[in-house]
A protein has these predicted regions:
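Extracytoplasmic catalytic/substrate-binding loops of multi-pass membrane glycan-assembly enzymes
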Residues: 51-64, 72-88, 92, 96-101
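Specific aromatic-rich, kink-prone transmembrane helix
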Residues: 68, 120-123, 161-179, 191
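Short acidic/glycine- and proline-prone juxtamembrane loop motifs at membrane-interface regions
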Residues: 150-160
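Conserved small/polar residues in nucleotide/adenosyl-binding loops
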Residues: 195-200
Length: 203
């Protein structure tokens, strides 16, 4: 298996030396990033229409009850996220006379951010040396596996947290692969720490 994996990675590196033309691109650049994110987002659309105006977990309902003073405020749920849900619910009530529509704005943010993050993750695996055919498989899985659109059509601390955890993992892996050189830039270190803090605070 190790020999096969090494051969595949070497083959992928040789592929990088050849210019590829076609709809599916996996180069580490803006255009492939946006294109693959769009593919994922379009494939998720049927689930988004089906699940409108979103799925709200029991934890989210509990946090809203805390925000409105029905339940006692405790540290069982993240403070920042409880306030965030409450503020968007208040905005929905003010702007649309329905708090659910305010909360759905957060789901829309998730449904935009998640395909962009998945596309970044896909392109990074290609950058690591994953062969192009396997990138096709990755893209199909991310776009067609129903768990992902159902998950991000839901609103909960887990769905918010993963939006920070994915980029943290990518930066962390990149730091290991580059033996720390990618973390030498202050901006990257600060970003990584912010992602770590946000992922922890939201979970």
């Amino acid at each position: 298996f190790a020999d096969w994996l090494i051969a595949e990675v070497q083959g992928a590196k040789r592929e990088d030396q050849v210019e590829h033309y076609g709809f599916f691109e996996y180069g580490y650049a803006i255009k492939p990033w946006l294109k693959n994110a769009a593919v994922i987002a379009v494939c998720w659309l049927p689930y988004e229409f089906w699940l409108f105006p979103g799925v709200y977990w029991s934890d989210t309902s509990k946090q809203l009850l805390i925000h409105y003073g029905v339940e006692r405020f405790t540290d069982h749920h993240p403070f920042a996220l409880t306030y965030l849900f409450g503020w968007f619910a208040d905005f929905g009530q003010w702007a649309f006379h329905n708090s659910i529509y305010g909360l759905y704005l957060l789901i829309v943010v998730q449904l935009i951010a998640a395909p962009l993050l998945f596309s970044w993750m896909l392109l990074y695996t290609r950058k690591m040396g994953v062969p192009q055919w396997l990138c096709h498989v990755e893209l199909a899985f991310l776009a067609l596996f129903p768990l992902f659109p159902v998950m991000f059509s839901s609103l909960a601390k887990d769905t918010i947290s993963v939006l920070f955890f994915i980029p943290f993992c990518i930066l962390f892996v990149d730091g290991i692969r580059t033996k720390g050189s990618s973390l030498s830039k202050p901006g990257i270190i600060i970003t990584c720490l912010l992602y770590t803090s946000d992922a922890a605070d939201d979970k």
